Amino acid sequence: MSTQKKTINFLQEFSIPLILGVLIALVWANLAPENYHHFVHNEIIGHISLHFFVNDIFMVFFFAMAAIEITQSLLPGGSLNPLKRAINPLMATLGGVLGPALVFLGLNALIGSPEFARGWGIPTATDIALAWLVARVVFGAQHAAVSFLLLLAIVDDGIGLMIIAFFYPDPANPVAPLWLLLTVAGMLVAYLLRRKNVQSYWPYIILGGILSWAGLYLAHIHPALALVFIVPFLPHPPREEFGLFEDDPQDHSTLKTFEHEWKIFVDFGLLLFGLTNAGVEFSEINTLTWLVLIALVGGKTIGIFLMGSLATVIGFPFPKGMGYKELLVAGVIAAMGLTVALFVSGVAFIDPGLQGAAKMGALFSAVAAVIAFALGKVLGIKKVKDTQA
């Protein structure tokens, strides 16, 4: 492998572009806030600002990557097929969504404000890439907890997509469901392309994707979800032989080609996402910040641990190699909600001050990585090394 390829892999694996974008945004917004906000919200082409381009167009491809992972997991041989083998992590996922939402709403009722209540969806998110990275450091690459956590994060993202679509329409523009017929038309186009055995992904993206995007946009549902409805129609193998983040050299399907050719664009494009969404002034920290942080680190950990434990009690055991200690640490790792949590913060609140406060709570959730590492040491978690290394 060339030095250039190794460098690119390192940057992708450790989410360096996203982290770099977040750091630049934080420094810029606190040193020159007016200049930063002008850069982000100033119209660059017609009425399109950089913020709109990143959140409403670029993020279409980010959520498409998540949809690919979900699609692969549902194939025979994938981690969600057959469903029975995934019951324990699926129940843990349910706890990881309900736990933080309930903690957020409960704490908000005690110490918060009614205007904060819309933020309940923010702490339900788990960052797939960061969770995978930290899990490999804490457990080792081949530990069962890594696959458990990946499955949890993927389904969590799927639920997150539904939360964004159904609970966070633009309050200034009520949902106009009739326009969703365009999205249905986009799905029909993708289905017909699949029936005609069209192998290039471009017709699916250009014809089906644009129709889907237009339908969501005109219906006032976030258009970043457009390709989520198209990806499952891309031709793919009849079964999933390799795990997530693993390349099958024999897989030249349309689904795999689309992922392979766009993933590097998405991974490095997250620098722009971090730059345009994480520019929060520290002066905006308030009670909402701590509600998001506590709901993420506390609510998600407790929810995952309780529901994963309940699944074991009622007859759906942990994956081989996992126990209660590993479940607890996995719950802490899942509390990192950076990417999707930042995104939901932007659609949950109109007030820039509330957006900033919520985003700061999402950023602070990175502390979960430190907690997970320390907890793993205290509990004596044994790392499972990569046998292929």
UniProtKB/Swiss-Prot annotation:
Decide whether keyword Transmembrane helix is in the record.
Answer: yes
**Can you supply a Gene Ontology BP term from the record?**
regulation of pH
Task: List the GO terms this entry assigns under cellular component, sorted alphabetically.
Answer: plasma membrane
Residues crossing the lipid bilayer are: 8-28, 48-68, 91-111, 119-139, 173-193, 214-234, 262-282, 288-308, 327-347, 361-381
Keywords on record = Antiport, Cell membrane, Ion transport, Membrane, Sodium, Sodium transport, Transmembrane, Transmembrane helix, Transport
Q: Which Pfam families match?
A: Na_H_antiport_1 (PF06965)
Q: What is its main location?
A: membrane
Q: How does it sit in the membrane?
A: Multi-pass membrane protein
InterPro entries, per the entry: Na/H_antiporter_dom_sf (IPR023171), NhaA (IPR004670)
Gene Ontology molecular function, alphabetical? sodium:proton antiporter activity
The reaction(s) annotated as catalysed by this protein in its Swiss-Prot or TrEMBL entry are: Na(+)(in) + 2 H(+)(out) = Na(+)(out) + 2 H(+)(in)
Q: What does this protein do?
A: Na(+)/H(+) antiporter that extrudes sodium in exchange for external protons.
Q: Which HAMAP family does this one have? A: NhaA (MF_01844)
The similarity comment for this entry is: Belongs to the NhaA Na(+)/H(+) (TC 2.A.33) antiporter family.
Family matches, as PANTHER family: NA(+)_H(+) ANTIPORTER NHAA (PTHR30341:SF0), SODIUM ION/PROTON ANTIPORTER NHAA-RELATED (PTHR30341)
User: What name has this protein been given in UniProt?
Assistant: Na(+)/H(+) antiporter NhaA
Organism source for this protein?
Desulfitobacterium hafniense (strain Y51)
